């Protein structure tokens, strides 16, 4: 066997082994790894939460999104929302203002600088002990914020993610036929969280 053939075989089999580890070995390792119990310490009162939403021309979604966050099963006095309008020109700002809830703050970012800058701008003024990020077209189940915050009762928890389900307007999670990739991704997250 020539050196070139040997090198090609090593690259091929090494690459195949790497792909196999990513899709089979890593999940299997997570599954077999023993779960570790978390030490939870309940706070005297729920921590303050700031929900941050970056929006660019989200006129169609922004009102439903903000109202969905305001309707969370979480103490109203411990929840506020910051919407950063990233140079929107479609009336997004007016819709947020019309909501008229003192827990909602609108920041205008001009000129448009992108989602990352919008999120950073919101973080500069956020007052919550816990920050929850939301896309401008995302809706949460009523207990989402409460469940996210509950995970922080364990001092070793540094961040928490939720499960993402892509739905068309009016569609339910049952009827969405959520993609295999998202099911796989959510399954891995669950294993990593044990």
Report each predicted region and the residues it spans.
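Conserved donor NDP-sugar-binding/catalytic core segment of glycosyltransferases
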Residues: 139-176
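A conserved acidic beta->alpha catalytic loop
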Residues: 85-94, 111, 138
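Glycine-rich, basic loop-to-helix element that forms the pyrophosphate-binding segment
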Residues: 109-126, 183
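Acidic helix N-cap motif at the loop->helix transition within catalytic regions
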Residues: 61-64, 78, 89-98, 106, ...
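Cell-envelope/extracellular polymer assembly enzymes that use nucleotide-activated donors
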Residues: 47-50, 80
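Short, acidic, metal-binding catalytic loop of nucleotide-sugar glycosyltransferases
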Residues: 67-78
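Short aromatic/hydrophobic "clamp" motif used to bind/position activated sugar donors
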Residues: 131
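N-terminal membrane-anchoring/stem segments of glycan-assembly enzymes
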Residues: 1-43, 184
